[in-house]
């Protein structure tokens, strides 16, 4: 068993935050590209810079939470195979830094909360965020 990191670091490891950051960069690029196309009248729509900023903030917060929750749930699902692989044996659950039950509760709360962040923007965004947690 390795030296136990701090609690916050364990949660970040459960979320696979480095992977989520790459996902979020892609999402932000898509938002900005879309809104630039709207402003250049390449596609129909009416978006202000404030709309773009709001979409980016909501996507960063909600997307990070939903994807991080999904990753935590996946680590619980893989708890039986992670100890046997060199790449995954240092994850928080195989090391005993956090219980599978605790990680599952964290993942579910994070995924649901992250998906709920999208509700004020559009219910379809919230639906697809929640739906994607399971894939």
Regions found by a protein language model. Name each.
Residues 1-6, 77-98:
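Cytosolic, membrane-interface loops and tails of multi-pass inner-membrane proteins
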Residues 33, 37-79, 126-135:
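Membrane-embedded alpha-helical segments that form the functional core of polytopic membrane enzymes
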Residues 6-19, 92-103:
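Interhelical loop and helix-boundary elements at the membrane-water interface
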Residues 87-128:
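Multi-pass membrane catalytic core of lipid/isoprenoid biosynthesis enzymes
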Residues 4-8, 12, 57, 109:
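Alpha-helical membrane-protein architecture signal
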Residues 16-34:
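The first (N-terminal) embedded transmembrane alpha-helix
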Residues 1-8, 27, 40-49:
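Histidine-/acidic- and/or cysteine-rich, low-complexity loops and terminal segments associated
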